[in-house]
């Protein structure tokens, strides 16, 4: 151990593996038909994704308590989905002619935790000269962008049969199109918790294996939380 009892400013660099859970609340269909499917599918309402990102911190070690400011940027998530469903509306039992409802849904969505600027207070438990488990709390100012472009087109299709071995005639009928487009750039303050263990390699250099949970706050119609496992090094001056 150093003569100052482990006190002093420090810098830390981490590589974090993040599990991100994004939940969207989009408007429900306004049509009186309760069986109508919303233009935004469940796939884009409840997103689970994983990413790897770097994180840097600067702080001060008081010899038991530590305070640190950290900054991180996350990978942008984007995806698209196309789906088709056909529902039979009417069938003539005599000749087999029928009318179907064809629904096509095209969705494009993005989500990006642009940045997170946090402040943590951490307490180190000194088990011996090498190992120091820790726990702490974190408050962070986060910036998030997300967008959705969802279009649903429904078409009534009538199929006329002409007899065995012949090609049926298909008549597209009336169609409707509904769309939902949304793009937001939101900044909020959220809360979280940190835990881990520090392993002193030298009096000034520490290997840090950590976990952190963060709830980014209510982002308009979006709830966002992250679980992160990280490995890094901390150098105290």
Swiss-Prot record:
Localization (cell): Cell outer membrane
SUPFAM superfamilies named among the record's database cross-references: OMPA-like
Cellular component, GO, one term: cell outer membrane
Signal peptide range in chain numbering: 1
InterPro entries: OMP/PagP_b-brl, Porin_opacity
Family designation: Belongs to the opacity porin family.
Protein name: Opacity protein opA57
Protein source organism: Neisseria gonorrhoeae
């Amino acid at each position: 151990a150093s003569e100052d009892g482990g006190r002093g400013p420090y810098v830390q660099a981490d590589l974090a593996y993040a599990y991100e859970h994004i939940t969207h609340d989009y408007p429900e269909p306004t049509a009186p038909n309760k069986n109508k499917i919303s233009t935004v599918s469940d796939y884009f309402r409840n997103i689970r994704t994983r990413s790897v990102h770097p994180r840097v911190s600067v702080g001060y070690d008081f010899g038991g308590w530590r305070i640190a400011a950290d900054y991180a940027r996350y990978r942008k998530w984007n995806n698209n989905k196309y789906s088709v469903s056909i529902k039979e509306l009417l069938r003539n039992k005599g000749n087999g002619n029928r009318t179907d409802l064809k629904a096509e849904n095209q969705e494009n969505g993005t989500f990006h935790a642009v940045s997170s600027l946090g402040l943590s207070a951490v307490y180190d438990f000194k088990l011996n000269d090498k190992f120091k488990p820790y726990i702490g709390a974190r408050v962070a100012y986060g910036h998030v962008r997300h967008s959705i472009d969802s279009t649903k087109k429904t078409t009534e299709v009538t199929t006329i049969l002409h007899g065995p071995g012949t090609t049926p005639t298909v008549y597209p009928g009336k169609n409707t199109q509904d769309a939902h487009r949304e793009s937001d750039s939101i900044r909020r303050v959220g809360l979280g918790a940190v835990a881990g263990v520090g392993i002193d390699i030298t009096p000034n250099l520490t290997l840090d294996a950590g976990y952190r949970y963060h709830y980014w706050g209510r982002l308009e119609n979006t709830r966002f939380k992250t679980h992160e496992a990280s490995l890094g090094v901390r150098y105290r001056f």
